[in-house]
Curated annotation (Swiss-Prot):
Pfam families: BPD_transp_1. The lineage of its organism: Eukaryota, Viridiplantae, Streptophyta, Embryophyta, Anthocerotophyta. Its main location: plastid. It comes from Anthoceros angustus. The keyword Zinc does not apply. PANTHER family: SULFATE TRANSPORT SYSTEM PERMEASE PROTEIN, SULFATE TRANSPORT SYSTEM PERMEASE PROTEIN CYST. SUPFAM superfamilies: MetI-like. This is Probable sulfate transport system permease protein cysT. It comes from the Eukaryota. CDD domains: TM_PBP2 (cd06261). It is a multi-pass membrane protein. It is found in: Plastid, Chloroplast membrane. Part of the ABC transporter complex cysAWTP (TC 3.A.1.6.1) involved in sulfate/thiosulfate import. Probably responsible for the translocation of the substrate across the membrane. NCBIfam families: 3a0106s02 (TIGR00969), permease_CysT (TIGR02139). GO terms for molecular function: ABC-type sulfate transporter activity.
Amino acid sequence: MSQLIFIPLLISLLVTKGKIRFLNNFESVLALSLHYGILVLALPIFILLYKAKKQPCSILLKVTTEPIILSAYATTFSTAFLAITINALFGLIIAWILVKYEFTGKETLDAIVDLPFALPASVGGLTLMTVYSDRGWMGPICSGLGLKIVFSRLGVPMATIFVSLPFVVRTIQPVLQDVEEELEEAAWCIGASPWTTFCQISLPLLTPSLLTGTALGFSRAIGEYGSIVLIACNIPMKDLVISVLIFQKLEQYDYQGAIVVATIVLIASFGGLLIINKVQLWKQNLSK
């Protein structure tokens, strides 16, 4: 195992041809950056995949087909998809308002968007509980509509919506700022309605960033733990998600099961991001 830990480092040394002089030229900076990225990102992922590969096939098959795990996967991905679908719509609207309009409190709204980035996950979960519990501000209203947010399955998408919204807004906002207003004004001059202008001019330009934001938000929603463990009841076959399930397996000293489940989530998240990047490149090539 100790030899495997140094394999990525050896690869990086070969790529840079052993030129590791301390920041005295571009190659040294590149080598240092490559080593840092491998140590921080690639090495933990590599070790996790290596641990999963060492598991017998019988254990892999048993773990991946357990009803509780299949239910947790279904809950995780379905609620994350629901959350990011809602955030794709409202995140686009919020980014549009922040860029296109001037109003009192704009700076405050712009700062609030980043709150999920700054808040600890447990604080976010406690905030949602305070708002949506039976004695919270929105709890009685939701109860009157027949909706129970806290300690129910609805708490999972509510938590993932909260943590993933900034990814959509912040990836769309800079692209929207760079869209030339002359294009929209030209469309209006030839009689196009605002909706037609948005659909045929603005939206195609925003699609790559929208896809990136939704992919990042989806990955963030899949991995959310701190707020979900507080706002949901985390009951198997009901609202248990993968991140909480992994922690429960570690508490039960089921390290093999935790590694297998975590590896599947890792592969799924990486595959989703890879597909989104391919789609972006394809759209960029079409636009040229």
